């Protein structure tokens, strides 16, 4: 299985980085071919300008700065996203990766006369999100869990029709104990093995 792990956190020593490392190790231990895309470490540019947004713009696969990211996405059978949830969703760096790479011609194509896109990432069979929240699960449920909906209702439908999605979350991160963080790392490891 070829797995693309996408990590988005600006601090190399963060708990998110520990989750990233745990995920990569667990996936490799089961024999996956893991491609780690650390958006901050690779200095990904999340800025989508007006020219790139234009319908006349060449697709992302034809842009020298985005082509390698498109290739990595197209190689993957499985996606694992690791990031903190800030203000209800992923960091802007991750959202910029979606905006610039998951574009028409790569992730979907428009269907004439329809509002529904046609999926183009049919090789992707699963998406797993590993995230942390500063707030409680209850607060996130009341807010409608926009980050979770982004993955389960939007990204997943651009993948294989039977693609699975999993959401591994540590809530109340700002108040967790070392034992709670260790237990979450263990949960991540066991889920991905």
Name each model-derived stretch.
Residues 1-106, 179, 183-193:
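N-terminal beta1-alpha1-beta2 submodule of the flavodoxin-like/Rossmannoid cofactor-binding fold
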Residues 6-7, 130-131, 169:
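Short beta-strands and strand-loop turn motifs
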Residues 10-13, 85, 134-138, 172-175:
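Short histidine/acidic/glycine/proline-rich micro-motifs that form metal-
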Residues 30, 76, 82, 122-123, ...:
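A structural motif corresponding to the C-terminal end of an alpha-helix
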Residues 39, 132, 170-172:
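Active-site donor-binding loop signature of nucleotide-sugar glycosyltransferases
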Residues 104-109, 161-165:
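Short, structured loop/turn "capping" segments at alpha-beta junctions
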Residues 109-157:
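Short, glycine-/small-residue-rich phosphate/pyrophosphate-handling segment
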Residues 138-142, 146-193:
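Glycine-rich phosphate/pyrophosphate-binding loop and the adjoining helix
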């Amino acid at each position: 299985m070829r797995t693309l792990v996408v990590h988005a956190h600006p601090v190399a020593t963060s708990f998110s980085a520990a989750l990233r490392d745990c995920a990569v190790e667990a996936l490799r231990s089961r024999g996956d071919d893991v491609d780690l895309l650390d958006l901050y470490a690779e200095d990904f540019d999340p800025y989508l300008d007006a020219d790139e947004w234009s319908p006349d713009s060449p697709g992302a696969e034809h842009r020298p700065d985005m082509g390698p990211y498109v290739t990595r996405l197209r190689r993957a059978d499985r996606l694992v996203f690791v990031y903190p949830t800030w203000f209800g969703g992923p960091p802007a760096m991750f959202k910029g990766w979606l905006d610039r790479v998951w574009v028409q011609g790569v992730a979907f194509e428009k269907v004439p006369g329809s509002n529904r896109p046609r999926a183009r990432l049919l090789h992707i069979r699963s998406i797993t999100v590993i995230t942390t929240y500063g707030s409680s699960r209850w607060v996130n449920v009341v807010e409608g869990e926009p980050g979770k909906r982004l993955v389960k209702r939007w990204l997943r439908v651009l993948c294989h029709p039977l693609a699975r999605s999993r959401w591994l979350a540590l809530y109340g991160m700002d108040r967790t104990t070392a034992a709670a963080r260790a237990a979450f790392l263990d949960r991540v490891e066991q889920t991905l093995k």
